[in-house]
Amino acid sequence: MKYEKLLPRFLEYVKVNTRSDENSTTTPSTQALVEFAHKMGEDMKALGLKDVHYLESNGYVIGTIPANTDKKVRKIGLLAHLDTADFNAEGVNPQILENYDGESVIKLGDTEFTLDPKDFPNLKNYKGQTLVHTDGTTLLGSDDKSGVAEIMTLADYLLNINPDFEHGEIRVGFGPDEEIGVGADKFDVADFDVDFAYTVDGGPLGELQYETFSAAGAVIEFQGKNVHPGTAKNTMVNALQLAIDYHNALPEFDRPEKTEGREGFFHLLKLDGTPEEARAQYIIRDHEEGKFNERKALMQEIADKMNAELGQNRVKPVIKDQYYNMAQIIEKDMSIIDIAKKAMENLDIVPIIEPIRGGTDGSKISFMGLPTPNLFAGGENMHGRFEFVSVQTMEKAVDTLLEIIRLNNEVVK
């Protein structure tokens, strides 16, 4: 194996349950994330990182790989998140399959679940590689403990294995709660103190992402007027029916299951209630700022029209922006995309530059003034029992980081 400790690190990290909790009011959202961040801090110190510190304000643990060059080069930041998605993460039992043939069905532990190339054709890309997958009872946690392990392996390489590898100052940060959308809300750009950064939180080999959705959340409250159904004519106002009418007024084809590429959508996450009162929760997504604003305006317009027809204010939307398309920031200086693209090409990796149909911590951090695109970490089928990662892809992620650092040495501030 190219990086001897990469896989052991990854296996150690995924066995720790760091599932974030969207119902929590604390930062980080769980005590387990606090404890894991402190554990990572100790590991960072053991590798030789300097100025390792935990920020109570945001749950990030930060450390520095000091420069070993006199060149005045840009300071690079590397970020990954410690939490995992909303799926069982207790008792993660990673399975290792060496020299996968690219065709066989992979049994997931003792469960009835399998990774079948007929269902997951991406498996065919991994012939001859070593895969780490689940036992079918949990997620794997490659999102984003692959990124955590890769950054730690990079640090080990620069500080201990090949300390003569020339580099400027590199800052490392591991944070909480990316999966519940609040991890970067309190990120401290001044404390991180770099010129640009990357999140190592992408998927398959070659992913290089700097364009995300712009995102908003909407909660629609529906106030009904409930009476006995036997005498309801011209009197009852059924809040659930109002919710149905509202949803049906949205564009039929602007839904996640009917869109792709750069197409945006409205997504109904939750609907509950009674004839007296109901509540619908939506997310709104689009890559283009104009269309994003039009979608938010439409949700208000539908409510206004329904209220006008009812003659009463019974439909009450609350719409809040969540994050924005970081391309608006990064396109002002594409050099950090160019250097990552060049690094991959130098390693015979084909860059995959496509808009993310989602967001990353980098979306928010970029709008705080620190451009932060996203690099591949290797995970496939993330957020569930069918998740897997290739060890060889993880190794190439470390290679890519090293090549970015090498190329950065040629850019004098």
Swiss-Prot record:
pH dependence: Optimum pH is around 8. The enzyme is stable in a pH range of 9-10.
Its EC number(s): 3.4.11.4
Main localization (coarse): cytoplasm
Keyword Hydrolase: yes
A Pfam family of this chain: M20_dimer
BP GO terms, sorted: peptide catabolic process; peptide metabolic process; proteolysis
Regulation: Activity is strongly inhibited in vitro by chelating agents such as EDTA and 1,10-phenanthroline as do the reducing agent dithiothreitol and the oxidizing agent N-bromosuccinimid. Phenylmethylsulfonyl fluoride, a serine protease inhibitor has no influence on the enzyme activity. On the other hand, bestatin, an aminopeptidase inhibitor strongly inhibits the enzyme activity and leupeptin, a modified tripeptide, slightly inhibits it.
Record's catalysed reaction(s): Release of the N-terminal residue from a tripeptide
Dependence of activity on temperature: Optimum temperature is around 44 degrees Celsius. The enzyme is stable up to 50 degrees Celsius.
Family membership noted in the UniProt record: Belongs to the peptidase M20B family.
Protein name: Peptidase T
Originating species: Lactococcus lactis subsp. lactis
Higher taxonomy: Bacteria, Bacillati, Bacillota, Bacilli, Lactobacillales
